Amino acid sequence: MTQEKEWEREYKRSKFLTKENKPQADAVRFVSFLRRQKFDAEKPKVLDLGCGTGRNSYYFAEHGAKVSGMEISRTAIDLAKQNAEKAGFNIDYKKLSIGETFPYENSEFDIALDVTSSNSLSESEREIFLIETHRVLKNGGYFFTKALCKDGDENAKNLIKKFPGSEKDTYILPDIGVKERVWSKEDFVSTYEKYFQILHMEKKTSYTRMNERSYKRNFWIVYMKKA
């Protein structure tokens, strides 16, 4: 099941809602990677999966890309549309779950982004998500994923122990109700390499705020390609 109610509730909390258009640093670094790969598509088509308020969509549109975004929260997608309209960007935002069939043609996009959005999908939704992302990417298209990392993350292991979800390596965030999946390197690779060639994978440590406290968390930064 989608977690539309949980995400909508969270986006309505003013402290959770990101109103700025500054992109996430990991998305900017991904663009640097693309340049090193000699990626030279003119006005590339970009699909921002779980786009939230459109921070990363805005960044790609600002640099000449034709962007589409999918987001389950009405509050978030409305703000994303407002920001795009103010800037004069024609970004195609749709209120949809990324765990369902995508409304796009085969091989439509050059780039797909998943910046910690698919973590809350169920296993059945994730299978659809991966099949659909593969379908709508062009051959040779790039897929950037930032996912929660289990390896070496004591906070993730504590959450699994105290607030376990019904599926492997999942937990339910207390006071929020959002489910999250954390990944070992082995599980991530075995799941994603069925669909994509993994070009680069690294573990990154940063801090996440929850219940007015900062927690050290690990993430996987992964660059992939549709071969």
For the regions a protein language model found, what residue spans apply to each?
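A short acidic, Gly/Pro-enriched loop at the edge of an enzyme's catalytic core
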Residues: 102-112
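Class I (Rossmann-like) S-adenosyl-L-methionine-dependent methyltransferase catalytic domain
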Residues: 1-44, 52-101, 125-128, 142-227
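A short glycine-rich, Lys/Arg-flanked "PGG" loop and its adjoining helix->strand segment in the class I
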Residues: 127-139
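A short SAM/SAH-binding and catalytic strip from SAM-dependent methyltransferases
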Residues: 110-125
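Residues immediately N-terminal to the Walker A/P-loop in ABC ATPase nucleotide-binding domains
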Residues: 42, 105, 138
